Amino acid sequence: MKRAWQIARAGLARFWRGRDREAGSMTVEAVLMMPLLLWVFGGSWVFFDAYRAKSINTRAAYTVGDVLSRESGYITPTFVNSISALQGVLMPESRAPRIRVSVFTFDAPTNSYRVRWSTARGTGVSALTDAALNEVRAELPDMPNLEVATLVETWTDYTPIFDVGLAPFTFEDRVVTRLRFAGQLCYSVTGTVSDALC
């Protein structure tokens, strides 16, 4: 045991004596450390950029939800196209943004959510169905019978700038907003009551 202690003390003494030595090659040290520093910088950049993209997608969904909650007129295809364009403005660097706007209600006797109307813009996104809505019921708020709310869903694809072990993926956000100024929000192709879905 005493011998092991002496070896450890001798090693520590050599280490402390060597810490004041300044002999070395800066080029060799740079060659050894530069790849690690570049990898750390690239990884930090990618993860920061991913959080930024997620934040922008979430803010866009909340903004669209807020716009819809204040609307008291008919929602028309032109209005939805404008909201899709707004999403594009809010997410300028986004790749293939997609959006789905739905109005739904809660039916207490059947303990289920029902879609009143739904419309979507973007590739690969279709209108929401009752079955699909009830699949995400864990993300929906508790509501009284026949309460109406809007559901805005946004998707955007994200591909990392550098390969740091993070595969390309899609950000998806769901935002539920209660209507503020009207009891219901109707969708109409013509903008009139004749074909309104409420």
Regions found by a protein language model. Name each.
Residues 1-89:
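Alpha-helical assembly-interface signal, strongest on the long, hydrophobic N-terminal helix that forms
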